[in-house]
Regions:
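Mobile-element integrase/transposase regions
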Residues: 42-113, 119, 132-135, 139, ...
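Short, polar/charged, Gly/Pro-enriched helix-capping and turn/loop motifs at alpha-helix termini
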Residues: 15, 30, 46, 147, ...
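C-terminal domain-tail junction helix/linker
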Residues: 68, 75, 80, 179-181, ...
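RNase H-like DDE/DDD metal-dependent nuclease/strand-transfer catalytic core used by mobile genetic elements
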Residues: 26, 87-111, 115-234
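Basic, flexible linker segments flanking DNA-binding modules
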Residues: 4-89, 161, 169-176, 249-259
């Protein structure tokens, strides 16, 4: 049952029982569920996590179907060729449309994520402009790194106008140059290549915005920001993460761990 579930993690208990019966193995759907329950595999999510972890530990090779499943399940899995070795080496940024607030208008979230630790930051704005992209870095992200005697080395963004433009005129490009930060962009017409931050957006929707949207009538962006700050504090310091390389650690614990891994030559070069 466990071997089959590794091969076909999305199949339900009845389908598993039927497929095993064709192989001469008699087990009921309830028996399949019992095995899954004993191994914490009752949900499809848990079975896909097991597949990803088993592959990461290099104990199995994935077939084409398994690769497609994991890429659909985990945006981060699509970034498996991107190796990040320490805190600040690669920081992903994006703009996310949250919704419209009565009396205020459209609300956008500027999201920032350290790709090594998955530590996240977010600020809400009523516009989608280069100045807001600069503001979240200058007022929130860079001071956090500086407080930990660290820095951002490379920014990864899509090709949105709030991030990209003529290097000698665009406010965001100029700010990154001033701070000595390299700017990389995702492939054109393929924003999903920034899978690190896509996973964050999905989590924010499922665990915060949709829940708050059903229970609270917000009257201002500031009110929304207060609740978002509270959630992000929980996300970074209390919520165990099961993504690639995280192994149940919190982003903040990984952030601190990654500080010790910054190569001396990198620190020296920057200095």
């Amino acid at each position: 049952i466990l071997d089959y579930s590794l091969t076909r993690p999305t199949h339900g208990p009845l389908r598993v029982a039927q497929e095993l019966a064709l192989q001469g193995i008699n087990v009921s759907a309830g028996g399949v569920r019992g095995v899954w329950q004993r191994h914490d595999l009752l949900s499809k999510h848990d079975r896909l996590l097991r597949l990803e972890k088993t592959h990461r530990e290099q104990t199995i090779e994935l077939n084409d179907e398994q690769i497609r499943l994991l890429e659909r399940f985990s945006p981060e899995f699509r970034e498996r060729q991107i190796e990040v070795h320490y805190t600040g080496e690669l920081v992903a940024v994006d703009t996310f449309f949250v919704g419209a607030l009565k009396g205020v208008g459209k609300v956008y979230l500027q999201t920032v994520l350290d790709c090594y630790s998955r530590h996240a930051w977010g600020r809400l704005y009523t516009s989608k402009l280069p100045v807001t992209s600069v503001h979240v870095l200058n007022e929130t992200v860079l001071p956090f790194f500086e407080a930990h005697e660290a820095r951002v080395y490379t920014i990864l963004s899509d090709n949105g106008r709030e991030f990209c433009g003529r290097p000698d005129h665009h406010p965001y490009e100029l700010f990154l140059q001033l701070e000595g930060i390299e700017h990389r962009t995702t492939k054109v017409r393929r924003p999903q290549s920034n899978g690190f931050i896509e996973r964050l957006h999905r989590t924010l929707l499922d665990e915060h915005f949709r829940i708050k949207g059903r229970t609270i009538w917000y009257e201002s962006v500031e009110q929304m920001q207060t609740d978002l700050d509270s959630y992000l504090d929980h996300y970074n310091t209390q919520r165990p993460h099961q993504g690639r390389m995280m192994e149940g650690q919190t982003p903040y614990s990984m952030f601190k761990k990654g500080l010790k891994l910054i190569p001396k030559e990198v620190r020296t070069k920057v200095a």
